[in-house]
């Protein structure tokens, strides 16, 4: 199964999806902000990165930009809990231009996320 780096400032999201992904057989590494997430990826590259867009310290757009610049083959899924659809769609459009493979709006359907993981990081 896949090794996944999950970056989100919301501990509840990390806990919930950590359990779901681990329950599906994936290894999950978690970070609470973009700086920590980038540092973890540099030390321990994973098969897939899931990052929130809006976070303190370093937001998801900066994380995506930096990781895709330094690791152009990285597979990234961007997620957002923004309730402002035009802003969320703008960030998703830009993230896709930067190389993000899939985007999800919170709340995320666990089955849809697991399906995307299977597509992006097959065994």
Regions found by a protein language model. Name each.
Residues 73-86:
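A short, hydrophobic beta-strand element within the central beta-sheet of small alpha/beta folds
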Residues 62, 83-104, 111, 115:
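Alpha4 helix (beta4-alpha4-beta5 surface) of REC/receiver domains from two-component response regulators
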Residues 42-44, 67-74, 98:
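Conserved phosphotransfer cores of two-component systems
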Residues 55:
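Receiver (REC) domain active-site loop signature in two-component systems and cognate sites
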Residues 44-50:
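Active-site beta3 strand of CheY-like receiver
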Residues 32-36, 59-63:
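Acidic catalytic/metal-coordinating carboxylates
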Residues 8, 52, 80:
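Active-site residues of response regulator receiver
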Residues 11-29:
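Two-component/phosphorelay signaling modules centered on CheY-like receiver
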